[in-house]
């Protein structure tokens, strides 16, 4: 690094004469305020005759004028009034004064004073005028820190790295570059300084309110990554390498590299990776260092898991391996960890910081560090959270507040919910009261109308009543009573049981016939009592079941309608035959007006029974014929008759029980009924007669009622309907799960069910796809489905009330040979697609076999392996080999070199490239092998056989189907398909047999068994190709890196020669002019930062650190730096040997000019050396004379240059020429 603000020494005589004048000129040129403070600082340093320090000052300095040039003067002035003039003069002094002067400035807290200037600028807000002041302060620090002593003092200064890193935020790129150089040197020299830099980066992130600590660094690189000037980019990437590679822990290095990758560093590298080496050699060197170190860390990390044989870069593979290890004993801890990770959000700032914190914790644990931090200072979790972000430290308290607020919110929500429920309940009860009031008046009105109708009916019965001889009336009454006895709708279960358990009637036990007058009187008395009793009881019933909201007319009809459920079978009633046939009952109505309603049931159970209800259109059983004599007239047509019921008649051993219907609408229990014809095989036949008197009907209705939200208008409209309002909108009688799945399946069709049915006849592929046909096979109607639907329809069920699923099953059931049609249709669609999958595989398989057989390049590779292998195995049992199996190719990488840095595969690649370059094209010749790995001949054979089997089954199924003219299109289409499919399947079988034959020949050709699985054979070749390709790319990369290393070393040797010649000139001139400064121009081990930066730029520093890693853990910090410096000095050698990361050693010969120069130097005679020395002395004397001629006032010149730099803010201040 060139010295900046260099100040040239004056002659001794001129210096003595002009010291006072220069001092006075300097002070007079300053502003009044500044002049006063300078005078104060100067007066405090004036020698005093009575002071004992006068002699020391006189010994140290030539005269009292030099007091303004003392370290104390500069430190006091900078602390009192930092300004551009004083810092410019300090820069000049640091370049011209001896190392003892610089050390004295450091001891006077000069570094802290300069850092305070940076802090002052940052604290007061950076202004335009502060840019130059900041640049000068950083330049002075760069000079003071150019030694180990200065760096140690800076590290010991509190908050030094924070104040230094804060100065990165400046518009001047040169200032940032100087800061980056200082930080890089500290990272490489001191472990403590390295940790302070990372902490300062975190603080800088918080000040700028950025999410990541390296955001500013990477973003500044992105801004210039496409520019032609690569110097700044090189300095930044040098700092990145210093930060990443200075850690001794591989896990921390990987973590830091991951942070930079997240911020987009890889993008910057990729943009500048392929530029010509001559344009930016140092930048390309840094890129190589970054990638080489990254690759080395990955290899070192892979060694940890080499026994697992997994890809450590695949998260899914790693998770599967972790789960495999932890699933037995560590299942619960792993599950708890995963559940906790799942609850952490990645969208918020706290969530992101939590993830990074977890990553850091796991890394610390993985390297056996149970505590966070080093042994000297353990960090608690709270402190670590606080260092990660201030907001995270308050997260615990914040979370408690959130939980408390959440509880209050839940309580408020619960109170609002209860309030809404109370309001709804109040509104509902108000509505119920209005409905009850309305129903009460309607009921009273309805009962009055019923009384009038019943009185009219009594009159009709009275006028039509007659008493035939022999007790015909009694026979008629028995006929009337039969339906009532079989309809226990309004009787208790116990009473029903008692009625059904009564013995059958016989002639001896039958009651005497009732006379006409007795029946009339009894009817009148019962009518009056039943009317009043039923009116009051029905009104009470209406109040109790107000939520039912049913029309009264339907309640009466349900009272009269017999229960369709199973009724205990009674023995036929036998009575004495009457002397004359009775009159037939009134004929039933065929859909005319409704019959006159019967009187309501009486509480006591007495009174005459109601007349039988008219048969519905669904076809109920006719009333039983009169006892004795011939039966009554047959049921009217359309009634259905007994045949339909006998088809689903329960077996004799079916369980017997009686259950009444609910009086309100209740929720249904979704079960699947066992068909009656299969009931005899179940355990239900063992139940016998079941008692139901324990059934609490009212409790069940109250618990499972289904409330309706119908309006009053809808209720009034429902009064006019003859159907029961307890029925839901739709009815499903099949398995609920199947009904739901079928509804989902049918929703995919955008056409009516009739079109779906027609598509099965017309083979319409616009409606049916392969997937829908495959699913249809699962939803074909079964016997149970159709039996359930038919049972519903036979029991007066309405077809339109069934769901779409039942309608679909009915449509499908009407299709002839449904299963065969669906299977044929499915195969017709599947067959071409399946062949399209098989044929290309067979063609690729056959082509790849031919490529392997005909590849001369692959044969050459096998030949080279055979020759080298025979040489290595010569004289052993493995020698004299004339052929080897393919798996030997996978073992090439296992044969390591003597230094274990390379292997036999790398050597073979190098031999092939040098001697048989065309053979490297074998990977292109065998490009189809990668796809053949996925092809299994066994799978293809199974698929072809399955297609053939399905085709034969479809052919046989269609042959058994009845052909009709209406289905001519279906049969003709399927006949053509079967004919073409047989031809195609035969061609496919021929191709398969040919491919199988060729593969067997290929397997034998490579020494394998003919029955080896094809996928195993091609996997071996493919693994070799992948391994060869990766190794070849690494070899190419190493070769390019070696070529760049040659150019770099040539440039390094040339620079070393120039530097050596320049140092000789400067040393000679300095010794002649000022013996005090002959030792060094900086502190002690001066030039350390320069040497380190040069070594870092050349890439030698990182190689040396990796080479010494783990071998010198307790050595001094400067040991590696000393080695680096020694290596940089001895870098000029006649030949260079470079070992690539792959282990190949390359001998590098310098360029002709360099070798010629070295050769000339080594063979030069003593006379030539003397002549060269004389020439150098002449050059030095000439330069010193020029310097003396150009001697000027440095402080005034610095001020002038600074003023100019304000106009060009982005010019480097260390490139200013004071001698201009």
UniProtKB/Swiss-Prot annotation:
The gene is forF. Residues 1083-1158 form the DAD domain. GO terms for cellular component: actin cytoskeleton; pseudopodium. Residues 575-638 have a biased composition (Pro residues). It comes from Dictyostelium discoideum (Social amoeba). Residues 656-1054 form the FH2 domain. Residues 501-518, 525-554, 1117-1142 have a biased composition (Low complexity). Interacts (via GBD/FH3 domain) with activated Rho-GTPases. This is Formin-F. Residues 6-373 form the GBD/FH3 domain. Keywords: Actin-binding, Coiled coil. It holds the Pfam family Drf_GBD. Residues 41-56, 555-564, 1066-1083 have a biased composition (Polar residues). PANTHER family: FORMIN HOMOLOGY 2 FAMILY MEMBER (PTHR45725), FORMIN-A-RELATED (PTHR45725:SF19). Residues 1-62, 461-659, 711-732, 1049-1192 are annotated as: Disordered. PROSITE patterns: FH2, GBD_FH3. Residues 11-20, 711-722, 1161-1192 have a biased composition (Basic and acidic residues). GO terms for molecular function: actin filament binding; profilin binding; small GTPase binding. Residues 532-655 form the FH1 domain.
């Amino acid at each position: 690094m060139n010295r900046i603000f260099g100040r040239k020494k004056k002659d001794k005589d001129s210096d003595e004469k002009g010291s006072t004048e220069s001092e006075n000129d300097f002070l007079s040129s300053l502003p009044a305020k500044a002049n006063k403070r300078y005078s104060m600082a100067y007066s405090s340093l004036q020698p005093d005759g009575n002071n004992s320090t006068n002699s020391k000052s006189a010994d140290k300095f030539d005269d009292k004028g030099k007091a303004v040039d003392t370290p104390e003067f500069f430190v006091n002035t900078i602390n009192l009034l930092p300004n551009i003039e004083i810092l410019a003069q300090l820069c000049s002094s640091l370049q011209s004064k001896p190392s003892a002067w610089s050390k004295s400035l450091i001891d006077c807290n000069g570094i802290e004073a300069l850092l305070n200037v940076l802090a002052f600028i940052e604290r007061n807000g950076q202004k335009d005028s502060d840019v130059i002041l900041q640049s000068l302060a950083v330049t002075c620090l760069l000079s003071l820190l150019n030694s180990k002593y200065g760096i140690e003092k800076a590290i010991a200064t509190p908050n030094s790295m924070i104040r230094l890193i804060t100065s990165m935020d400046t518009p001047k790129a040169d200032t940032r570059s100087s800061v980056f150089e200082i930080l890089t040197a500290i990272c490489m020299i001191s472990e403590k300084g390295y940790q302070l830099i990372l902490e300062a980066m975190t603080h800088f992130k918080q000040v700028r309110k950025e999410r990541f600590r390296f955001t500013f660094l990477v973003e500044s690189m992105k801004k210039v990554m496409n520019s032609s000037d690569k110097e700044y980019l090189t300095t930044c990437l040098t700092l990145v390498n210093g930060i990443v590679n200075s850690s001794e822990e591989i896990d921390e290095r990987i973590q830091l590299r991951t942070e930079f990758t997240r911020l987009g560093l890889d993008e910057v590298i990729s943009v500048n990776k392929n530029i010509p080496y001559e344009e930016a050699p140092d930048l390309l060197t840094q890129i190589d260092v970054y990638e080489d170190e990254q690759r080395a860390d990955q290899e070192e990390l892979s060694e940890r898991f080499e026994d697992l044989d997994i890809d450590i870069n695949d998260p899914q593979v790693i998770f599967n391996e972790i789960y495999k290890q932890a699933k037995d004993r560590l299942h619960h801890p792993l599950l708890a960890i995963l559940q906790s990770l799942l609850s952490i959000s990645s969208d918020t700032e706290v969530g992101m910081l939590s993830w990074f914190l977890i990553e850091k914790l796991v890394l610390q644990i993985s390297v056996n560090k149970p505590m966070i931090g080093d042994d000297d200072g353990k960090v608690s979790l709270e402190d670590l959270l606080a260092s990660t972000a201030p907001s995270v430290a308050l997260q615990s308290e914040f979370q408690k507040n959130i939980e408390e607020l959440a509880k209050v919110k839940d309580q408020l929500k619960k109170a609002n919910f209860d309030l809404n429920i109370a309001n709804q309940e109040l509104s509902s009860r108000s509505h119920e009261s209005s409905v009850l009031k309305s129903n009460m008046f309607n009921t009273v009105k309805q009962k009055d109308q019923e009384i009038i109708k019943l009185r009219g009916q009594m009159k009709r019965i009275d006028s039509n009543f007659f008493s035939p001889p022999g007790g015909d009336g009694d026979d008629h009454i028995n006929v009337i009573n039969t339906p009532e006895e079989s309809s226990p709708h309004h009787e208790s279960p116990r009473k029903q049981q008692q009625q059904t358990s009564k013995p059958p009637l016989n002639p001896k036990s039958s009651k005497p016939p009732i006379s006409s007058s007795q029946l009339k009187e009894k009817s009148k008395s019962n009518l009056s009592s039943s009317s009043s009793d039923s009116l009051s009881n029905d009104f009470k019933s209406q109040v109790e079941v107000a939520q039912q909201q049913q029309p009264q007319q339907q309640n009466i009809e349900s009272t009269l309608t017999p229960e369709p459920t199973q009724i205990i079978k009674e023995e036929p009633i036998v009575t004495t035959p009457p002397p004359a046939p009775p009159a037939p009952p009134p004929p039933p109505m065929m859909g005319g007006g409704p019959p006159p309603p019967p009187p309501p049931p009486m509480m006591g159970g007495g009174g005459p029974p109601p007349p039988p209800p008219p048969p519905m259109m669904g076809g109920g059983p006719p009333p039983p014929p009169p006892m004795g004599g011939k039966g009554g007239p047959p049921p009217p047509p359309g009634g259905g008759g007994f045949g339909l019921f006998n088809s689903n008649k329960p077996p004799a051993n079916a369980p017997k029980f009686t259950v009444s219907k609910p009086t309100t609408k209740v929720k249904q229990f979704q079960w699947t009924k066992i068909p009656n014809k299969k009931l005899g095989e179940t355990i239900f036949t063992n139940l016998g007669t079941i008692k139901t008197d324990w059934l609490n009907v009212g409790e069940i209705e109250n618990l499972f009622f289904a409330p309706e939200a119908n309006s009053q208008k809808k209720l009034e409209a429902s009064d006019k309907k003859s159907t029961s309002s307890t029925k839901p909108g739709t009815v499903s009688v099949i398995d609920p799960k199947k009904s739901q799945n079928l509804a989902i399946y049918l929703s995919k069709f955008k056409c009516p069910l009739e079109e779906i049915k027609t598509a099965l006849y017309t083979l319409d592929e616009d409606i049916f796809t392969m997937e829908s046909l495959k699913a249809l096979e699962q939803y074909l109607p079964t016997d149970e489905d159709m039996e359930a639907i038919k049972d519903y329809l036979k029991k007066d069920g309405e077809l339109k009330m069934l769901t779409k699923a039942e309608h679909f099953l009915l449509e499908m059931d009407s299709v002839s040979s449904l299963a065969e049609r669906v299977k044929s249709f499915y195969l017709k669609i599947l067959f071409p697609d399946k062949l399209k999958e098989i044929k290309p595989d067979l063609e690729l398989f056959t082509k790849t076999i031919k490529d392997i057989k005909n590849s001369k390049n692959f044969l050459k590779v096998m030949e080279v392996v055979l020759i080298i292998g025979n040489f290595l195995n010569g004289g052993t049992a493995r020698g004299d080999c004339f052929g080897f199996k393919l798996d030997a190719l996978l073992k090439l990488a296992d044969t390591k070199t003597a230094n274990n840095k390379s292997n036999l595969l790398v050597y073979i690649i190098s031999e092939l490239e040098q001697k048989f370059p065309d053979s490297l094209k074998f990977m292109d010749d065998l490009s189809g092998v990668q796809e053949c790995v996925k092809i299994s001949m066994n799978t293809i054979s199974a698929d072809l056989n399955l297609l053939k089997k399905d085709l034969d089954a479809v052919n046989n199924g269609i042959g058994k189907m009845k052909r009709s003219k209406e289905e001519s299109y279906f049969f003709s289409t399927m006949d053509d398909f079967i004919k073409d499919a047989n031809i195609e399947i035969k061609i496919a079988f021929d191709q398969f047999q040919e491919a199988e034959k060729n593969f067997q020949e290929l397997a034998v050709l490579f020494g394998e068994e003919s029955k080896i699985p094809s996928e195993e054979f091609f996997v071996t070749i493919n693994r070799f190709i992948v391994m060869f390709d990766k190794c070849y790319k690494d070899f190419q990369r190493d070769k390019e890196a070696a070529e760049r290393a040659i150019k770099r070393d040539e440039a390094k040797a040339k620079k070393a020669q120039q530097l050596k010649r320049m140092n000789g000139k400067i040393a000679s001139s300095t010794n002649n002019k000022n013996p005090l400064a002959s030792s060094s121009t900086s502190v002690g081990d001066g030039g350390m930062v320069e040497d380190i930066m040069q070594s870092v730029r050349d890439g030698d520093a990182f190689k040396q650190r990796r080479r010494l890693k783990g071998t010198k853990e307790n050595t001094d910090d400067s040991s590696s730096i000393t080695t680096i410096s020694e290596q940089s000095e001895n870098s000029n050698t006649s030949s260079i040997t470079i070992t690539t990361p792959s282990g190949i050693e390359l001998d590098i010969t310098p360029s002709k000019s360099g070798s010629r120069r070295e050769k000339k130097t080594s063979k030069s005679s003593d006379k030539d050396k003397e002549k060269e020395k004389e020439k150098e002395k002449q050059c030095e004397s000439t330069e010193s004379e020029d310097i003396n001629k150009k001697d000027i006032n440095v402080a005034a010149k610095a001020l002038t240059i600074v003023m100019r730099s304000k106009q060009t803010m982005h010019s480097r201040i260390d490139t200013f020429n004071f001698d201009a």
